[in-house]
């Protein structure tokens, strides 16, 4: 039996129910569970040293269970965070489960800033390791709310933007929600000197999302609204580009979209996010043309 296994066996014994005369010598239940948690933690760290991450994560969870029984929820949350770190690379679903439980403890304690930090990590885990954009969106939005409650506006906006971006993903495609999110973020950033540099990007993304919904009247109305919020927007390349895109959709001409995109890309490189939505706008026009031809035959 390895040293880690011996420590686990001792801890398991301390966690076992004790009754009758034996309970007189075993000490209080709380103390026994605290001792067991210490033993589990030692064993988990040994597994860590041996690079047996999944085993370490499992034993950190056992430590958390013992700490909960000892009514040491703060310690339990910390053990669950350690379990999450161990699972993160090879067992992301277990990592997410542990992180969720830890965040619940932080929330119950009113530690919303710490909870927000780990909620954002959870969202990133869903996004990058588990390919689960829907859960990632929910986690980013909740992290944003907690950051906002702690007056961390920049961090809140970062989470809200991530959620909005994921709402535009191929798996979700909720462009209405994304458009409304970008618009709200922009409005709340108007008087923020640091966030003001990002305004034109928020404006442009909101308009793109409306165009992806074939809703050029709303996109055109947004252009006017954004200029009323920030008159400098009218002098940007993003405004000129958006104006041409609205015209292209209104005319039902994908070539206008393609030409405007190429012209903009020559000076300001379009990222993959925007390219995908621009392609969707073009394809929507072509699809509607095909349907119109079918109606005539």
Curated annotation (Swiss-Prot):
- Which Gene Ontology cellular-component terms appear in the entry? cytosol; SNARE complex; vacuolar membrane
A single Gene Ontology biological process assigned to it is: vesicle fusion with Golgi apparatus
Q: How does it sit in the membrane?
A: Peripheral membrane protein
Is Transport found in the keyword set? yes
Q: Which InterPro entries match?
A: NSF_attach, TPR-like_helical_dom_sf
Query: For this protein, what is any one GO molecular function term?
Result: ATPase activator activity
Q: Give its localization.
A: Membrane
Swiss-Prot/TrEMBL keywords: ER-Golgi transport, Membrane, Protein transport, Transport
What does the function comment of this entry state?
A: Required for vesicular transport between the endoplasmic reticulum and the Golgi apparatus.
Q: Which family does it belong to?
A: Belongs to the SNAP family.
**By what name is this protein known?**
Vesicular-fusion protein SEC17
* Naturally occurring in which organism (per UniProt): Komagataella phaffii (strain GS115 / ATCC 20864)
């Amino acid at each position: 039996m390895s040293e880690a296994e011996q420590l686990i066996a001792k801890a398991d014994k301390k966690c076992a129910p004790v009754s009758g005369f034996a309970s007189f010598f075993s000490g209080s239940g709380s103390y026994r569970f605290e001792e067991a948690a210490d033993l589990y933690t030692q064993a988990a760290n040994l597994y860590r040293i041996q690079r047996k991450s999944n085993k370490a994560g499992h034993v950190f969870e056992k430590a958390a269970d013992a700490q909960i029984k000892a009514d040491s929820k703060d310690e339990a949350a910390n053990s669950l965070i350690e379990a999450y770190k161990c699972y993160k690379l090879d067992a992301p679903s277990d990592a997410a489960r542990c992180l969720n439980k830890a965040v619940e403890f932080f929330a119950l304690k009113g530690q919303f800033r710490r909870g927000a930090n780990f909620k954002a990590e959870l969202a990133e885990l869903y996004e990058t390791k588990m390919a689960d954009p829907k859960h990632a969106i929910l986690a980013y939005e909740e992290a944003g709310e907690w950051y906002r409650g702690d007056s961390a506006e920049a961090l809140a906006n970062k989470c809200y933007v991530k959620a909005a971006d994921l709402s535009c993903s191929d798996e979700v495609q909720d462009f209405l929600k994304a458009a409304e999110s970008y618009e709200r973020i922009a409005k709340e950033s108007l008087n923020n000197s640091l966030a003001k540099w990002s305004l034109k990007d928020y404006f442009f993304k909101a308009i793109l999302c409306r165009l992806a919904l074939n809703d050029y009247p709303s996109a055109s109305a947004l252009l006017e609204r954004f200029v009323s919020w920030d008159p400098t927007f009218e002098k940007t390349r993003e405004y000129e580009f958006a104006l041409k895109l609205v015209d292209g959709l209104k005319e039902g001409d994908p070539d206008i979209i393609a030409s405007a995109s190429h012209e903009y890309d020559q000076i300001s490189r379009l990222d993959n996010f925007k390219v995908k939505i621009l392609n969707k706008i073009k394809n929507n026009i072509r699809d509607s043309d095909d349907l119109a031809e079918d109606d005539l035959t």
